[in-house]
A protein has these predicted regions:
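A short, charged/proline- and glycine-enriched loop
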Residues: 1-3, 62-63
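Short, glycine-rich nucleotide/cofactor-binding loops
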Residues: 4-16
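Histidine-anchored nucleotide/phosphate-binding helix
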Residues: 13-28
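Short, surface-exposed basic-aromatic patches at helix termini and helix-loop junctions that form
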Residues: 23-26, 79-81, 103-112
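S-adenosyl-L-methionine/SAH cofactor-binding core of RNA-modifying enzymes
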Residues: 29-97
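C-terminal accessory extensions appended to soluble enzyme cores
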Residues: 49, 55, 133, 137-189
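Structured adenosyl-cofactor binding patch, chiefly the S-adenosyl-L-methionine
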Residues: 103-152
Length: 189
């Protein structure tokens, strides 16, 4: 069974991060999720997975794959046998992308790792995990349905655009209901 590791790279633990990590936990199971690099807020996240305060680059692991959009190879179902750990940068992406995964995560490992990409478009962390889980379970990237960009209605006459790539589940973009409710209630988006 694969372990999915989210290296928290945001300056603090935002409410939307907690919602996203909870969504990931529901998808892959608490026993298969690690959240690393958390200085504060780790107690709240323990119900969703294993929480490690230090960076994943300080945890000695083998059979590691870092998901990096700049990786030269795409993740394939055959990689499921090669890797035990799939590591994701928990970063709120910018549009256009700032290419933070390499300098803030991939380049910091002192032990051997391999990198893979899941396409050239930026995804939310929960969507990236869902895509990797599908590929590890036998689907090729090319077989997965996606939608680029979504608009979420907040209230009458007000909406928010997310320019990221979303996996389609039952024909709809994979977005946590809890996140949508949070965005609708949040002031000052």
């Amino acid at each position: 069974m694969s372990t999915y590791i989210i290296e928290h790279l945001e300056p603090k633990l935002w409410k939307w991060c907690i919602i996203e990590y909870k969504h990931i936990s529901h998808m892959v199971g608490k026993q298969n999720l690690w959240i690393t690099n958390l200085k504060k807020g780790s107690k709240e996240l323990q119900k969703y997975g294993k929480v490690i305060k230090m960076s994943v680059v300080q945890v000695p692991l083998s059979k590691v794959c870092v998901l990096d959009p700049d990786a030269h190879k795409m993740l394939t179902p055959a990689d499921a046998k090669k890797f035990d750990y799939f590591i994701f940068g928990g970063i709120l992406g910018n549009d256009p992308p700032q290419k933070r995964t390499g300098p803030e995560l991939t380049s910091l490992f002192t032990y051997p790792i391999e990198t893979r990409n899941i396409g050239s478009k930026q995804m939310s962390t929960d969507n990236a995990v869902a895509v990797v889980q599908k590929i590890v379970n036998g689907k090729r990237f090319e077989q997965l349905p996606f939608q680029d960009g979504i608009e979420i209605d907040l209230k009458e006459g007000e909406s928010i655009m997310f320019p990221y790539r979303y996996l389609l589940k039952d024909g709809k973009p994979l977005v946590s209901e809890e996140l949508m409710e949070y965005l609708k209630k949040k002031k000052g988006i």
